[in-house]
């Protein structure tokens, strides 16, 4: 009898049943992340479209003033008389002269109202 009692004492205790995890407070579908801001060094100002000039290039023709031209730094400057916006290279007179778009104005140097990246 003593051996049987010892064997019962040596048996491991029954495993505890885990409790149900608390319900998540967050919704099932998390909110969509906003698009990542591109680096400042490769962007144009918002007044000229606010698009970035990536090395892969871009496209032109959105209703908000367009995107950057290929090569980086070039903004699409929308004209009031024409319906479509036209892309300009950074070397042209109607766009940024630098890829950063921060130090130089375009369109004759008259500032943002000329459609440049200042």
Curated annotation (Swiss-Prot):
InterPro entries: LCE (IPR028205). Residues 87-118 are annotated as: Disordered. Residues 104-118 have a biased composition (Gly residues). One of its GO terms (molecular function) is identical protein binding. Skin-specific. Expression was readily detected in adult trunk skin, adult arm skin, fetal skin, penal skin, vulva, esophagus and tongue. Not expressed in the cervix, rectum, lung, colon, or placenta. Keywords: Keratinization. Residues 90-103 have a biased composition (Low complexity). One of its GO terms (biological process) is keratinization. Induction: By UVB. Belongs to the LCE family. Interacts with CYSRT1; the interaction is direct. Precursors of the cornified envelope of the stratum corneum. Belongs to the LCE cluster present on 1q21. This is Late cornified envelope protein 1B. It comes from Homo sapiens. The lineage of its organism: Eukaryota, Metazoa, Chordata, Craniata, Vertebrata. The gene is LCE1B.
